[in-house]
């Protein structure tokens, strides 16, 4: 049976409208796609990380409720899970502030086996973060070796536009790995100016 394996960030998004919090929901670029696939009944596995706190429990429970296998989610017992504050304007466009508390050694999990029938999803800043690059490449190399479909969701935010030149070799390497690339006009504008 075909499986979708995603690697990426999980975060609790707290949305603000008129400077008032309105809702808190788990999110993340790859995460959101996996939730939709899990709800549709697809066989979904997620490789990610959360803190061993109440927010981490909320995120893990949300994943399980939406059909996502969490066996490859690293839980850091003495850390806080990441959160983002999303301030929505009158057009519902968001301006983000991120708060993270990761250890220096990250994502110390065994990667799931990948078969030729699988689809591997990766993306966002998580896919180009130097501290995680070896783990991301480990999964991508497995996927490439067996002929799995590799889907790259660029999701390159304006907050990282000033780093685009420094990150470009990794971004281009991700393009080379990918069979399918998804990105918005804004993503590519942030990367290439």
Language model regions located:
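Short polar catalytic/cofactor-binding loops
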Residues: 8-13
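Substrate-binding N-lobe of the ribokinase-like
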Residues: 3-4, 17-84, 88-93, 100-105, ...
